[in-house]
């Protein structure tokens, strides 16, 4: 059992027959009332992100998640295929379980497969990833009022805002948490 006051990003727990990972947790106390813990959590079975509020001191069951290092091989349209780096065993995961992660998967990338009681839940990406810009337009001179950006398409098809100095064919570092530009690659 784990006390909800100990919630930090990355902690996994069971609640109402579902498995969640904490994305963020905010502790608040109002006057003489009991403290509350407002958490943003991701359901590891469905991929849905929700906000749950717990009473301070409430206890939930800790979920012991097994993480296996895998390499992404390919996407066949309905599922992705990963290969275990040590046993060379291949595993398929439905695309519906990993819709967000699909935006950042390139051939050969190392990911962590999350399993709970031999049930495949989802994959965990590195915090930042390097991707190539496949298309963007040239900067327009004079368009530099406040923090100017332009749209760019990555090699995976995902679109992000990048600074004006980034050109087509360059690599950029992207955060997999929020899908935003971090720096040049």
From Swiss-Prot:
Which GO BP terms apply? peptide biosynthetic process
Q: Which GO terms describe its cellular component?
A: cytoplasm
Q: Does the keyword Cytoplasm apply?
A: yes
User: What PROSITE patterns has UniProt attached to this entry?
Assistant: EFP (PS01275)
Pfam families linked: EFP (PF01132), EFP_N (PF08207), Elong-fact-P_C (PF09285)
Under CDD domains, the record lists: S1_EF-P_repeat_1, S1_EF-P_repeat_2
From which domain of life does this come? Bacteria
State the Gene Ontology terms under molecular function.
Answer: translation elongation factor activity
Xref: InterPro entries: Elong-fact-P_C, NA-bd_OB-fold, Rib_uL2_dom2, Transl_elong_fac_P/YeiP, Transl_elong_KOW-like, Transl_elong_P/YeiP_cen, Transl_elong_P/YeiP_CS, Transl_elongation_fac_P
Key words, A-Z: Cytoplasm, Elongation factor, Protein biosynthesis
Q: Where in the cell is it found?
A: Cytoplasm
What pathway is this protein said to act in by its record? Protein biosynthesis; polypeptide chain elongation
Which NCBIfam families has this protein been placed in?
Answer: efp, PRK00529.1
> What the protein does?
Involved in peptide bond synthesis. Stimulates efficient translation and peptide-bond synthesis on native or reconstituted 70S ribosomes in vitro. Probably functions indirectly by altering the affinity of the ribosome for aminoacyl-tRNA, thus increasing their reactivity as acceptors for peptidyl transferase.
Q: Which family does it belong to?
A: Belongs to the elongation factor P family.
Name this polypeptide is given = Elongation factor P
Traced from the root, the source organism's taxonomic lineage reads: Bacteria, Bacillati, Mycoplasmatota, Mycoplasmoidales, Metamycoplasmataceae
Gene field: efp
């Amino acid at each position: 059992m784990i006390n909800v006051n100990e919630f930090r990003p990355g902690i996994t727990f069971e609640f109402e027959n579902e498995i969640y990972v904490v994305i963020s947790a905010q502790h608040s106390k109002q006057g003489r009332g009991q403290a509350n813990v407002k958490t943003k959590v991701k359901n590891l079975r469905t991929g849905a992100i929700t906000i749950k509020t717990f009473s301070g001191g409430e206890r939930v069951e800790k979920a012991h998640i097994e993480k296996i290092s895998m390499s992404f091989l390919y996407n066949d349209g309905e599922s992705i295929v990963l290969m275990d780096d040590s046993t060379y065993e291949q595993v398929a995961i439905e695309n519906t379980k990993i819709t967000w992660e699909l935006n950042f998967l390139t051939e050969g990338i190392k990911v962590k497969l999350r399993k709970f009681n031999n049930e495949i839940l989802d994959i965990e990406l590195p915090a930042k990833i390097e991707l190539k810009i496949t298309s963007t337009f040239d900067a327009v001179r004079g368009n530099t009022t406040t923090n100017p950006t332009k749209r760019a398409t990555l090699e995976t098809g995902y679109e992000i805002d990048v600074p004006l100095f980034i050109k087509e064919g360059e690599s950029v570092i992207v955060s997999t948490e929020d899908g935003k530009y971090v720096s040049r690659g």
